[in-house]
């Protein structure tokens, strides 16, 4: 099993607090994060995991819910949770 360092951006922490305030089911986010931490790849198709482009090149996007996404970066040595939120909040 690959062992990676795990990082959380400062903005990710703020995004999580906002999701909690909006009464999102945080267990869904935690489960997706656990899959990534445990290197359960590829992710199940329900998460619609895909690479991002443009200014987010090098990052990936997985859907917690249809309009709630997790942006993360995965390398051989690092798993970085960058952002979470709606498409409009993150890309709009």
From Swiss-Prot:
<keyword id="KW-0238">DNA-binding</keyword>
<keyword id="KW-0678">Repressor</keyword>
<dbReference type="GO" id="GO:0006402">
    <property type="term" value="P:mRNA catabolic process"/>
</dbReference>
<keyword id="KW-0255">Endonuclease</keyword>
<dbReference type="GO" id="GO:0003723">
    <property type="term" value="F:RNA binding"/>
</dbReference>
<keyword id="KW-0805">Transcription regulation</keyword>
<keyword id="KW-0804">Transcription</keyword>
<feature type="active site" description="Proton donor">
    <location>
        <position position="87"/>
    </location>
</feature>
<dbReference type="InterPro" id="IPR035093">
    <property type="entry name" value="RelE/ParE_toxin_dom_sf"/>
</dbReference>
<dbReference type="InterPro" id="IPR007712">
    <property type="entry name" value="RelE/ParE_toxin"/>
</dbReference>
<dbReference type="Pfam" id="PF15738">
    <property type="entry name" value="YafQ_toxin"/>
</dbReference>
<keyword id="KW-1277">Toxin-antitoxin system</keyword>
<comment type="function">
    <text>Toxic component of a type II toxin-antitoxin (TA) system. A sequence-specific mRNA endoribonuclease that inhibits translation elongation and induces bacterial stasis. Cleavage occurs between the second and third residue of the Lys codon followed by a G or A (5'AAA(G/A)3'), is reading-frame dependent and occurs within the 5' end of most mRNAs. Ribosome-binding confers the sequence specificity and reading frame-dependence. The YafQ-DinJ heterotetramer binds the consensus sequence 5'-TTTGAGCTACA-3' in the dinJ promoter; DinJ also binds DNA but not as well as the YafQ-DinJ complex.</text>
</comment>
<dbReference type="GO" id="GO:0006415">
    <property type="term" value="P:translational termination"/>
</dbReference>
<dbReference type="GO" id="GO:0004521">
    <property type="term" value="F:RNA endonuclease activity"/>
</dbReference>
<comment type="similarity">
    <text>Belongs to the RelE toxin family. YafQ subfamily.</text>
</comment>
<keyword id="KW-0378">Hydrolase</keyword>
<dbReference type="GO" id="GO:0003677">
    <property type="term" value="F:DNA binding"/>
</dbReference>
<keyword id="KW-0540">Nuclease</keyword>
<dbReference type="InterPro" id="IPR004386">
    <property type="entry name" value="Toxin_YafQ-like"/>
</dbReference>
<comment type="subunit">
    <text>Monomer in solution, forms a heterotetramer with antitoxin DinJ, with 2 YafQ-DinJ dimers associated via the N-terminus of the DinJ antitoxins (YafQ-(DinJ)2-YafQ).</text>
</comment>
<protein>
    <recommendedName>
        <fullName>mRNA interferase toxin YafQ</fullName>
        <ecNumber>3.1.-.-</ecNumber>
    </recommendedName>
</protein>
<keyword id="KW-0694">RNA-binding</keyword>
